[in-house]
């Protein structure tokens, strides 16, 4: 909303006490965000309250005080670190949330410079979501590092900054400045964040909510050894103090390139843009790239490129006039939890789903969010009626990441986890050691039957592409299909009676069903939906036993001899075949013509691929990714999605990227597609 329109919404009778209460609320949020690294509300809510305070102070300038949040940058530092006074204040940026507010930023510059802002060159950068730092080099050697803190005083984090691998301890130049202060953002890439949380879970430790919290918590450890273990990265965005006989370049963009030339890392997405349309194009381009960047950003930063013009434009109390952060629509918002419903999955898992007051988050309206399980409800301390924080990043399913406790209503209601299935009323049980509660109804439960059918026809199972979720729902609602075998009994007349089913659609579905009869033993096993038997385990079972009869009669001990089959999975396979209903469905499927060739035992004792950990990357030209994976699994290989010290081989197709670089770094054996095919003996 334009600033003027917002101002008109406020009543003239606002009291000083109300304004002070708003300031105190903002101070509390700032303290939790900057000092405790534990945000209480989404950034969007903080920004809204800050705008409200700015507007109230605009209406009542006589009420502005030097300690107002509008006059400061961050929060006071903790006493656990030595304090560092910034010679040049580390200011924050004003924000724009719409094209109209960007226009206002350009228009305001007209009062301070003679040039037309719409023809100026801007240095455009992604707005990294990390922690702002200052790093001082004396005679080219890293001497001191500090957090931004409140803009005037930060915390001395020199020992921790020294542990970050992409920050040089010595500048890459012959005649370094006497003093050079590099300013930048320390952040944690998404992959490193995920691996950090995985390790924490394995150790039973607390996980971080997001990469920013992880970066902040890691950078402000009192023990640098802990920081050294964290995957932190610096991207420089500017220069503070500079003392040298040599002059710096005259533009911001050139200064960043100079920093890069002396070993200081800068972001690869920085571009120059001239005029409004190019600024908007940069914003749109970075927003489109956001899901694939590999690190969190929450907008763009647009800076007048000419340093002389920056100096002419100057500063206001807490930010420069020559730069603005044009932020993306928030990925976090607040809304109210109206109710919780419980869904039943293919394996009987009971999943609580939050029913929310609809809220616009990251470009879409969200009214539902997963709550995962009872443990998550307990961890969040959430009750019906709470104001909650919703996060939606990229294509990730919206989730509740926090509760705003000071907004809990008096009539809030505890969430009661069901003891009976909401679909079939069978008992709900939770096995000791598992987080998930499950319906015990099995295929008696309509919800489990529906999800089992969806799994059966899926691409990696029987691959019946003419039968989708909506068709399965119709078939079940009309009680035309009860088990997977019933799909193979459908005829043209039956399908034509269904809604939105034309002649061509019906025939396509029947053709897909007929085609699916010819499958593989591994696909068939996976399609049966035996709990914890995924693609790889199904392939291992097929390779080990060679035929279905051997699998059906395998003992617990024989199953445990299969690669990656432990006690739990072996038990589940045995129990599956002990259930008469399951055996009847399998026999019915075979009687309907579902068939496959038994797996031929191939002697692979001398093949170097046997039993190895393998990763695929890049574009393969002679095989599809699925074909290559199946071929590897036939040699008993474990196919992984990421490179680690445990990886034996990396098969690199065309345009291989970061996985190839990591494999080279770790000394992993690298095969081309041709070398891989030669090893397998495939033509």
UniProtKB/Swiss-Prot annotation:
Zn(2+) binds at residues 421, 424, 439, 445. It holds the Pfam family HHH_2. GO terms for biological process: DNA repair; DNA replication. GO terms for cellular component: cytosol. The keyword Translocase does not apply. GO terms for molecular function: DNA binding; DNA ligase (NAD+) activity; metal ion binding. The keyword Glycosyltransferase does not apply. It catalyses: NAD(+) + (deoxyribonucleotide)n-3'-hydroxyl + 5'-phospho-(deoxyribonucleotide)m = (deoxyribonucleotide)n+m + AMP + beta-nicotinamide D-nucleotide. NAD(+) binds at residues 43-47, 92-93, 125, 148, 185, 303, 327. Keywords: DNA damage, DNA repair, DNA replication, Ligase, Magnesium, Manganese, Metal-binding, NAD, Zinc. The active site is at residue 127. CDD domains: BRCT_DNA_ligase_like (cd17748), LIGANc (cd00114). Its cofactor is Mg(2+); Mn(2+). Its EC number is 6.5.1.2. Residues 604-683 form the BRCT domain. DNA ligase that catalyzes the formation of phosphodiester linkages between 5'-phosphoryl and 3'-hydroxyl groups in double-stranded DNA using NAD as a coenzyme and as the energy source for the reaction. It is essential for DNA replication and repair of damaged DNA. Belongs to the NAD-dependent DNA ligase family. LigA subfamily. This is DNA ligase.
